[in-house]
Amino acid sequence: MLVISANEQRNLVNMNEVIAYAALALKEFSAERTITPIRGSLPFANEKNTALIMPSVAEGLEALGLKVVTVVPENKKIGKKTINGIVMLSDFQTGEPLALLEGSYLTMIRTGALSGVATKHLARHNAKTLCIIGTGEQAKGIAEAVFAVRDIEKVILYNRTEEKAYAFSQYIQEKFGKPAYVHTNANEAISEADIIVTTTNASTPVFSEKLQKGVHVNAVGSFKPSMQELPSHAIVGANKVVVESKEAALDETGDLQVPIKEGLFKANAIHAELGQIISGEKAGRENDEEITVFKSVGLAVVDIIVAKYLYEKAVESGVGNKIEF
């Protein structure tokens, strides 16, 4: 069995390739060619933290695996990662353990790739300004993926802890050579954006102003009914609301559950799963005036396909630590 660390994965990753594999996984899922149950969500430590159990089988892609991650928001106060985890791949023919991959980096990359796929199909082609609300680890992968599919010229950042936004601004400028500006008001931050990303642990909406025509939103932070990043009017006012899995999104996120409970939005108003847009079954963006929202909660089959991609690259490159059970 091969053990692949975060650093080893980092050296193997090509974001354009990861985006392509994420799209393939989404397409297989929406065509009902995978077994991807609703993930198990286990609260612990007086419900402050969450463990997520995510298995998947993709028959056509010969992939079988399991991801287990923990989300501990308070870890950031002690300088530790808020997401820790592991992904196990099994041999599709024999069922033997094939690989163990560090899970927090993989999660960051696949979260980014999902937003990359959504941005490719739903953002305006001439989108130039990206606004990111929440500048934690997940924002790194999303920024890289959005840059891969759109020619972004300006980045606007907002974070509750301003110092972290400034640190992220420096990261963007040094790694990607793009100007990045910190705003102290979230409503001001979104006002000039073509693409908005929300990646926070918020339980109440992170902005209140109405969305401008033509904007695209990737909302990736809320993965529990008690979490809500988007104001209800952002969902209700969107021309197209898109998800990875209708079942998972309706089961897991306050971003959809709250407006539904308020009687403002109906489950059947979800435009499509992203895989249906990739396959051409449903339309993506159709004009420059549309407001589009991609509400992401994560999907195990994407993790497993990205893990398989990383495993194959590791074998090809002679990377990783081989161990005997």
Swiss-Prot record:
Catalytic reactions of this protein: L-proline + NAD(+) = 1-pyrroline-2-carboxylate + NADH + H(+); L-proline + NADP(+) = 1-pyrroline-2-carboxylate + NADPH + H(+)
GO molecular function (one): oxidoreductase activity
Leading EC class: oxidoreductase
Keywords: NAD, NADP, Oxidoreductase
One annotated Gene Ontology cellular component of this protein: cytoplasm
Cited SUPFAM superfamilies: NAD(P)-binding Rossmann-fold domains
Keyword Kinase belongs to the record: no
Membrane spanning stretches: none
Enzyme nomenclature, EC number: 1.5.1.49
InterPro entries: NAD(P)-bd_dom_sf, ODC_Mu_crystall, ODC_N
Protein role: Catalyzes the reduction of Delta(1)-pyrroline-2-carboxylate (Pyr2C) to L-proline, using preferentially NADPH over NADH as the electron donor. Is likely involved in a degradation pathway that converts trans-3-hydroxy-L-proline (t3LHyp) to L-proline.
Family statement drawn from the similarity comment of this UniProt entry: Belongs to the ornithine cyclodeaminase/mu-crystallin family.
Protein name (database record): Delta(1)-pyrroline-2-carboxylate reductase
Species this chain originates from: Bacillus thuringiensis subsp. konkukian (strain 97-27)
